[in-house]
A protein has these predicted regions:
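Small-residue-rich hydrophobic segments that form or flank transmembrane alpha-helices
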Residues: 9-77, 137-142, 152-206
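Hydrophobic alpha-helical transmembrane segments in multi-pass integral membrane proteins
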Residues: 47, 89-92, 142-150, 184, ...
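Hydrophobic/small/kink-forming positions within alpha-helical transmembrane segments
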Residues: 56, 60, 79-87, 117, ...
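Transmembrane helix exit motif
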Residues: 59-67, 104-129, 218, 238-248
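Interfacial helix-loop-helix linkers and transmembrane-helix boundary segments
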Residues: 63-77, 93-103, 123-128, 194-199, ...
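Cytoplasmic-side transmembrane-helix entry/capping segments in multi-pass membrane proteins
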Residues: 72-82, 104-106, 128-138, 168-175, ...
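Interfacial loop-to-transmembrane junctions
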Residues: 169, 214-236
Length: 248
């Protein structure tokens, strides 16, 4: 860790804090921001490896906070697809372009955001997508989560039309990605993404991540459902734009 300057430690504290905020209740846009900042210091896949232990360590607290607000029916549909996506990514990681999947996820995110905001304006009724679509979206979420820790857009594409409360939305997302991150751990090891120095560096930022969780939860409790989902849709929209822009 001696090769890191004080400025780099300060810079890396931001993604650690953003990981906590995303787990505390303000959505996956912050997790992507964490990956982007980390990629300024590490190569992208190494940045993902730096963040994964922080995600795994913070996930149990996030799940515990929202433990009474989990929509189990969606878990049963999305999780098999996510696991399939993670497994396929492990075998195909050296054969497919992460830029291409980022573009696909980006367009999906934009479509989701525009559709969601339109539904809010016209007060569209609750809509449940076919389970096959849920498995497909889960697989895309597993892929994008594996590569850039940004699995929220396809998962949100399935959950948001259900018009869940923000607490139930967060509880469901928290459990889904807690399981997803554990599933990703073994493939990351097999790909040789972890080393002793990187793990020691990551563990340094655990307190900052936990602080972010409580800050995210505090903010989540202070805003209405309307404001929360506006933040989610807006962040997903700009997240999609950014994924496309930097992948072209």
């Amino acid at each position: 860790m001696s090769q890191f300057s004080l400025e780099m430690y300060v810079l890396l504290s931001l993604p650690a804090f953003f990981i906590g905020i995303s787990r505390g209740g303000l959505g996956g846009g912050f997790a992507l921001a964490a990956a982007i900042i980390s990629a300024q210091i590490f190569e992208p896949i190494k940045a993902a490896a730096f963040l994964l232990p922080l995600l795994i360590i913070s996930d149990p607290l996030s799940v515990w906070i929202y433990r009474k607000n989990i929509y189990w029916n969606s878990i049963k549909i999305l999780l098999p697809g996510i696991i399939l996506g993670v497994v396929l990514t492990f075998f195909l990681i050296n054969k497919i372009s992460s830029a291409m999947i980022s573009i696909i996820v980006g367009f999906l995110a934009i479509f989701l955001a525009v559709d969601g905001l339109t539904r809010k304006l016209v007060k569209a009724p609750k809509k449940k997508l076919h389970p096959t679509i849920g498995v497909f979206l889960g697989a895309i979420g597993g892929f994008s989560s594996f590569v850039i820790h940004s699995g929220l857009p396809p998962i949100a594409a399935y959950l948001l039309p259900l018009k869940l409360t923000r607490q139930k939305f967060m509880g469901t997302v928290a459990l889904i990605f807690a399981i997803t991150n554990i599933v990703k751990l073994f493939p990351y090891f097999l790909l040789g993404l972890f080393d002793k120095e990187l793990i020691k560096l990551t563990l340094t930022f655990i307190p900052i991540t936990f602080l972010g969780i409580f800050v995210g939860k505090f903010i989540n409790n202070k805003i209405s459902d309307q404001v929360f989902f506006f933040i989610i849709y807006t962040s997903v929209f700009f997240l999609g734009l950014r994924l496309i822009w930097f992948s072209i």
